[in-house]
Amino acid sequence: MDYFLLSIVTFIPAVSALILLLVARGNDHAAALVAKRFALFATSVTFFVSLFIVVQFDPENTSFQMVEETDWIMGFKYKLGVDGISILFVMLTTFMMPLVIWASWGVEARVKEYMISFLLLETLMLGVFMALDLVLFYLFFEAGLIPMFLIIGIWGGANRVYASFKFFLYTLLGSVLMLIAMVVMYAETGTTDIQALMSHQFSYNNFGLFGLQIVGGTQTLLFLAFFASFAVKMPMWPVHTWLPDAHVQAPTAGSVVLAAILLKMGGYGFLRFSLPMFPVGSYIMTDFVLWLSVIAIVYTSLVALVQSDMKKLIAYSSVAHMGYVTIGIFAANQQGIDGAIFQMLSHGFISGALFLCVGIIYDRMHTREIDAYGGLVNRMPAYALIFMFFTMANVGLPGTSGFVGEFLTLVGIFKVNTWIALLATSGVVLSAAYALWLYRRVMMGDLIKEALRTIQDMSLRERAVFVPLIGMTLLLGVYPVLVLDLIGPSVQTLVDNYNSALSIAGINGDATIASH
């Protein structure tokens, strides 16, 4: 089983989608229930089989493990593998998807197609995190747009068509430059093998282009091409504007997948490609990325403060939290990258839970306007408690996973740039401001609005969906070494290779390159 384990985990959802497409018949309630149960079964099996990856994984071995490789088309290879960085994203994906399906039990329109879309999306997301061939990675990375485009465009809100096309075009245009860069890399190296490309040293000699001096040469241009794609995916300021629209229009399950998993592809891309393949380009562009990140943290936190739509507020909160991730990654030290990966994992649980919370009251009241609520704690005490827990985790309360990621990230950046660190720390205060403001407006006070007097608290199924999310948020908050021990050796190797590449290039503190 070991040899094909990664392929089995990757393609269980896609094969299940095919079975659902061929076997399921009818559009009545019974057929819809069969589709839901089958999708839940398929995603649960995927999760339990993926646990074998963790069992067989050796954290001390920093090379790729359980590698599967076979010739594919035109000399490109079908190659999968996991290391200490990618294994966490694989597990996050397989962990979240059964909860997403479970939370979609109330969907009534085109249920079979809805479940097929999510099953295909899971396979494509897993492929992104396991692919060890550049072409294979790109295919998974881009193909993932299609199911998400359909999920927003078919099952979304009133402006779903606009939001879905905006999401599609932003991410597609960002990836055009990455595709050009891949062609350049293949032309220079003759391979698309990611392991081989990580050990290849691309030129960092300065050259002129259109009258401009390109410091860092080819590496800087390749870095910028990949950066364009990953910055949109994160998303980073100022290319974040597709995210609030996509979140607001997406169905609840779509928002959960978008926030919990899809955004993490950008951070994963920086860790898998930018730092190891273009270390000199990454170093030269570090200040640029750090300032964009800190602007994102402060600006989107302030924008979140004035939102009237709950989903939009949480969407802007996501952009701010992803700002901490890019700060941690480009701090390029052990604490920074540990914190960035931890933050991405934690954000997956917390933001996913917050979107589920919004979905629960939207299903009852069919509005996300903050002003439409107030005093819900009187009618929905269990809901108020769960919302409070994840609000506090989002703020970074000690004892929750949200604290560990932010703390490590800030420790990492303090060693690199004190001003960036101080400005980023202000984001912690701002996140407390908008999160507690949201909670007070929705939950506290008297139950004045007539429409809320008959609202029902969470059902048993709705409560059950949150149990694993609460468990993971607490477990990683009080016992973070569970994750840090898993990623530590791989992160240390990444940092060591990055620093050795810089020293070989003769880079000194002011980002100039020694002549050679």
Residue ranges, per PLM feature:
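Hydrophobic alpha-helical membrane-insertion segments
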Residues: 41-55, 171-183, 393, 429, ...
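Cytoplasmic/organellar membrane-interface segments at the starts of transmembrane helices
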Residues: 380-382, 435-516
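Hydrophobic transmembrane alpha-helices and their helix-loop junctions in integral membrane proteins
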Residues: 101-105, 123-135, 148-438, 443
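Helix-to-loop transition at the C-terminal end of transmembrane segments
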Residues: 53-64, 185-192, 480-485
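Central hydrophobic cores of alpha-helical transmembrane segments in multi-pass inner-membrane proteins
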Residues: 7-25, 40-53, 90-104, 121-123, ...
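Transmembrane helix-loop-helix hairpins at membrane boundaries of multipass inner-membrane proteins
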Residues: 1-5, 19-116, 195-206, 211, ...
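Alpha-helical transmembrane segments and their helix-start/interface "positive-inside/aromatic belt" motifs
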Residues: 32-44, 162-174, 380-384, 460-468
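Short phosphate-coordinating micro-motif centered on Lys-Gly-acidic
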Residues: 142
